[in-house]
């Protein structure tokens, strides 16, 4: 399976993918963690930024031109089963990733918090669900949550792992998360 990191330019925090976290750009740190984990065949950075560069992942240009649902559909079409990661969540817990890979049985799988929040950009999207993804989008679906709720499997995780899903949206998040 391929790890696919979805990257787009941030309107709220321009240049955030390059913000240094532990000496690496935000996205580059995530790519290094995933590529070094030994859990994936390949780490792909699926970016709308044609100038993005990485030492830890292969850059593939996302020219879907739409919302994240369109990007996920394009990635599943190109790569088959994918483990989708957000480019702005630096606290990936490899034990959660590993547990999800072990539980994956060919059906889209998404972690769910104790307060019922789905983490759709820390989710496995299955090739066998591609037709359902396309139908969902074709029928006006826009939310990845809606797709997973209707077509996926949810996997609960513990409160101690909530940090895994903290993301950086604003410069103030760097302070809040002690980065």
Sequence positions of predicted segments:
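Active-site acidic Asp-centered loop
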Residues: 47-48, 85-87
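Aromatic-glycine-rich donor-binding/catalytic loop that engages nucleotide-sugar donors
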Residues: 127-138, 177-179
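Conserved alpha/beta core of the MobA/IspD/sugar-nucleotide pyrophosphorylase nucleotidyltransferase superfamily
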Residues: 140-179
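Conserved donor-nucleotide/metal-binding helix-loop-beta segment in metal-dependent transferases, i.e.
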Residues: 93-117
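N-terminal glycine-rich phosphate-binding loop and ensuing alpha1 helix
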Residues: 1-49, 98
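Conserved nucleotide-sugar donor-binding
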Residues: 119-132, 171
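A short acidic, helix-capping loop that chelates divalent metal ions and anchors anionic groups
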Residues: 12-17, 118-119, 132, 164
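Short phosphate-binding loop-to-helix
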Residues: 53-85, 91-99
